[in-house]
Regions:
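Short, cationic low-complexity segments
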Residues: 120-145, 199-206
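Acidic/polar-rich alpha-helix caps and helix-coil junctions
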Residues: 1-117, 149-383
Length: 383
């Protein structure tokens, strides 16, 4: 069953946590806290019990407690970087205090191109490489707007588009400028290299933004020409401490202990607010505020849940978590089909797009694996 498979995965992480050391002599090797962080993530997904159409029918309280138990082992072993940007810079910034587990890359191992991050070679903009894939949506950009109190515009954030020409009209979350490249602003903080509209692949179709987190500056020693593509050797953080804090907060909220989750979410927000060192020259209005129960927000369980989900979207944007979060919460269909419907008004390539609930939450199981299991595995619904 689905629950059996989650338990098998959790069992592997539990076993790893028992035998791995608290620290490793070689950089990049998994340690005890990494195992506990992944155990927490596994138990969090397992807690959301779903029917065959992936609707959440129960949130298992015992599993949520296991999330708290596992994250407790990570608390204090890592901490947030002083600046959000430091998680996404190469060289001395890699393997920092927030990185719980990272995939290691290099460009100096003696081979022609080194151990480059080939998974991101297509994410470099056309202006400095190829091929401008993995692009932030306009919807995501708009989500970084905040109100006069520095809180998210939960319900009306997408009523107008945020771009370079309208930045002065909005107050925004500083994380926008560490996540999204906007024409007219420096590329990866380089004042001598302004991100241009002509760097973009088919802008009239796909928009003018690009992803910043996995990229480096054009003159960086970590950017390597592997003609016709450009790769870089910057590590990719697979799980970081901010994610652990938000997983713990999510478990607390679903246990009805949202008041205990509040300082965890605020810890992430307060770090985001002070992450302005590298963007201080940008002529923009940035600044967000912590949630203050009874002052700027009424911190009920429902409100806390919405705030937590919003925080995960902004904090972890373009890091590969969003779709899986939506599936875990059982809201992939409603979220994505609403998105397709709204975006199709401006982005014509979304016309006719839809998310097939009960099928597209998961990929099909390869037939070879079903054969190897001697039909113990049953093909996912809809395939």
């Amino acid at each position: 069953s689905n629950d059996d498979l989650w338990s098998a995965i959790a069992g592997d992480f539990e076993a790893a946590a028992q035998v791995l050391p608290s620290s490793q002599p070689q950089v990049g090797r998994a340690d005890k806290t990494a195992a506990y962080a992944y155990l927490a993530k596994t138990r969090l997904y397992q807690a959301y019990e779903q029917d065959e159409n992936h609707n959440v029918v129960n949130i298992n309280q015992e599993r949520l407690q296991q999330v708290l138990d596992a994250t407790e082992q990570v608390m204090g072993m890592h901490q947030l970087e002083e600046d959000f940007a430091y998680n996404f810079l190469p060289g001395s910034f890699e393997n920092g205090q927030e990185a719980v587990f990272s995939i290691q890359f290099s460009n100096n191992d003696g081979t022609l191109h080194g151990r480059l991050n080939y998974s991101d070679v297509l994410a470099t903009p056309q202006g400095i490489g190829c091929c401008d894939f993995h692009k932030p949506s306009q919807n995501l950009v708009n989500a970084y707007k905040v109100d006069e109190q520095g809180l998210p515009l939960f319900s009306n954030y997408n009523q107008s588009n945020l771009d370079f020409n309208s930045l002065e009209n909005y107050r925004v979350d500083p994380r926008l400028y560490h996540t999204v490249a906007i024409p007219g602003l420096p590329w990866k903080y380089d004042q001598e290299n302004i991100y241009q509209e002509n760097w973009v692949r088919s802008p009239s179709t796909y928009g003018y933004t690009a992803s910043l987190k996995e990229n480096v500056t054009e003159d960086s020693e970590y950017l390597v020409n592997i003609d016709p593509f450009y790769g870089n050797s910057k590590n990719r953080i697979e799980i970081r401490y901010a994610d652990v804090l938000l997983m713990r907060a999510e478990a607390l909220i679903e246990l009805g202990r949202q008041n205990e989750a509040l300082p965890l979410i605020n810890e992430v927000r307060e770090r985001a607010n002070q992450s302005t060192t590298l963007i201080s020259s940008y002529a923009t209005n940035t600044g967000i505020s912590p949630y203050l129960d009874g002052e700027n927000i009424n911190w009920t369980q429902d409100v806390a849940r919405e705030a937590l989900r919003w925080e995960r979207r902004l904090e972890l944007a373009m890091e590969g978590n969003r779709f899986f979060d939506l599936v875990r919460w059982g809201i992939a269909e409603e979220t994505l089909n609403k998105y397709y419907s709204e975006e199709a008004e401006e982005a014509t390539y979304y016309e006719g797009a839809f998310f097939d609930e009960g099928r597209e939450e998961y990929l099909p199981i390869p037939q070879a694996q079903i054969n190897f299991s001697q039909d113990v595995y049953v093909q996912n619904t809809g395939y």
